[in-house]
Swiss-Prot record:
Transmembrane regions listed in the UniProt entry: none
The species this protein was found in: Nitrosomonas eutropha (strain DSM 101675 / C91 / Nm57)
PANTHER family assigned to the protein according to its UniProt record, in alphabetical order: ATP-DEPENDENT CLP PROTEASE ADAPTER PROTEIN CLPS, ATP-DEPENDENT CLP PROTEASE ADAPTER PROTEIN CLPS1, CHLOROPLASTIC
One Pfam family, short name: ClpS
Family (UniProt): Belongs to the ClpS family.
Domain of life where this protein originates: Bacteria
Subunit record text: Binds to the N-terminal domain of the chaperone ClpA.
Name by which UniProt lists this protein: ATP-dependent Clp protease adapter protein ClpS
Function of the protein: Involved in the modulation of the specificity of the ClpAP-mediated ATP-dependent protein degradation.
Gene name, Swiss-Prot/TrEMBL: clpS
InterPro entries: ClpS, ClpS_core, Ribosomal_bL12_C/ClpS-like
Lineage: Bacteria, Pseudomonadati, Pseudomonadota, Betaproteobacteria, Nitrosomonadales
Amino acid sequence: MAANNRNPESVIEKGKTRLTPPPLYKVILINDDFTPMDFVVKVLRHFFFMDEEMATRIMLKIHTEGAGICGTYPGDIAATKVQQVNEFSKQNQHPLMCVMEKE
């Protein structure tokens, strides 16, 4: 015969688990006077998967307004994109800067 080991103190209460979405960050390219426009378009297409038209539109916004948002991502993805773009720019000897800003 099996013993009934139900102890009222060992009952696990079901609680409501609330998941909150992670904070989002804008990834922003900053204009400079030296990076060629076609390089900016290349960065937008390669790292942010934009088509030619969208990349050109964002590049012109960066050029005329001084900065442009490339996308909005959770913090770890935004940080990775910023690092990748900044390293790629440096490797290609361009001063193009990419930063992230909390939304």
